Amino acid sequence: EEKMNVTQGKLFLGYRTNTPPESSDYYAAALCGVILGQGTQSKLFVNIREKHSLAYYAAAYTNKMKGILFAFCAIDPKDRAVAEALIREQVAAIRNGEITTEEYEAAVKLLRNDLASYGDSQSQLLQYYFGQTFMEQIADPDEYARHIAEVSVEDIVKAAGRMTLDTVYFLTSEDEA
């Protein structure tokens, strides 16, 4: 926990994916991150922001090269315990296979649309390929999209099962006791 002169608390839960970036299982880990916290149909957005009205924003981000997934939200500092419990519940739900067809399809569509949009921007395409330079094999965006389409819900559940909580960080108000 860290205190600063802020009005919103920032809660981060850092998970190790335990999935090497060159593994074919990486695509399932990527979809796991999308289902957890990318887009308006993600579990964090629906449950923390919409259903419980706790967060100004709630999202997740996967860093392929570092093998980490961050789940994070901006909240009223008094809501830390509830928000942290809800994040943990959403990760557990994915581990337990509680992934709806809508969540799965929205995640696949979001990732595939992102990959398709790379061709519209030289800087995005450059950034994508720069990230690929550290890989044993370079997958172009179309190939990456094909791999995403091959991932099953069961693969995502297995990827979530490999994740381990590593770090909990909370930036809070100096006034919060």
Which residue ranges define each predicted feature?
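Short, conserved charged micro-motifs
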Residues: 23, 79-83, 177
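C-terminal regions of mature proteins
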Residues: 105-177
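M16/insulysin-pitrilysin zinc metalloprotease superfamily fold
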Residues: 59-118
